[in-house]
Each structure stands twice: as C-alpha cells, then as structure tokens.
C-alpha cells in the first residue's frame, strides 16, 4: 500500500509563521525529509524518521534527484512523508520537480503552502509589496541561476512594479548592474 507525501512550506523562518495545518501534518508523519531552511524546532521532538537533505547555496549534501528518490521510496514503503521546506514549496523550492516524481509513481500527495519570504520579509519591514498608485504588480525573480540569461533583465528593467529577488544576496551587485544597464533608474528603492 502506498503512503502519501505532503510538501510542506515552513514559512520564512519565524516559528510562529508556519501554518496550523503544517504542524498537524508534521505531528502525524512517519518520515520527515527536511532542508536547512526549515527550523529544527518543527521536527526535533517528533517521534518519526528524520532525513536531513540539508541544501544550502553552493553545497547540496543531497542532490535533487536523490531527494526525489527518497520521498518516492518512503511513500512506496507505505509511509506518510513530510517534505519540509523553508518558505513555500513552489516558490523556487523545487516542489514542482518533486511533484513530477510523485506523479510518475502515482503516489498521492498534498501541498501545504508556506508563507514565502518574497512577501513576508518586505511586510515585516513595513514595506508593502504592492501599494495602490505606486506598485500595482509584483514580480518574484530568482537571484541565483545556473545560467544568468534565464532572467530577462531587459524586461524587468522596464517594469514599474515591485521586483523581489530571492536567493540573490551573493549576486546583488550583478543584479543591480544588469537592471541599470537596461535602463532601471539607479535611485530605484
């Protein structure tokens, strides 16, 4: 009998920003497969198998295809699996790739959304990502790509709305320079 996999977003890091549904599912799982960005407080006291796939920038202790294999194998063993991810599973969390792996094996799954840092960080700093008469649209862009040209800086530089770059701390100067190269005002906040 196949188990079920829950792709669970742990939110932006503060322990009180994870959803009640996520906490309920965590309390019932047989296996939790977690990333570095998910707080240890969410799983350290659980009475279940814990698998650290500790991904961080520039160092993947476990490759994505291996993570896919782990969650598939555990589900095929009949286990209830939580794939615990920082932020939201589908905002640069590679949750889409994990869903494809589950679908290929006809494994039931459910996504439990998490609060993405793309929204929460500006809000916690008192900055609304959208604001009537100032920014009517919001673009969430990766700040870390294998191939820089995957990001259309020319189009982004022309946008009047809010640009949020995730995972871009190491590339912030390059990102800003590319946007200004295509016409973004250097005084843009």
Describe these PLM feature segments.
Residues 88-90, 95-159:
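Class I SAM-dependent methyltransferase SAM-binding "motif I" and its flanking Rossmann-like core
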Residues 25, 117, 171:
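Short phosphate-engaging motifs
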Residues 1-10, 15-112, 120:
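Class I S-adenosyl-L-methionine
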Residues 2-7, 76-81, 137, 146-189:
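A contiguous loop/helix-start segment that scaffolds small-molecule binding in enzyme catalytic cores
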Residues 45-47, 64-65, 122-126, 142-143, ...:
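Short secondary-structure transition/capping segments
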Residues 21-25, 47-50, 98-101, 127, ...:
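Short, solvent-exposed amphipathic alpha-helical segments in soluble enzyme
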Residues 49-55, 106-110, 129-136, 183-189:
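Short hydrophobic/aromatic-enriched beta-strand-loop microsegments
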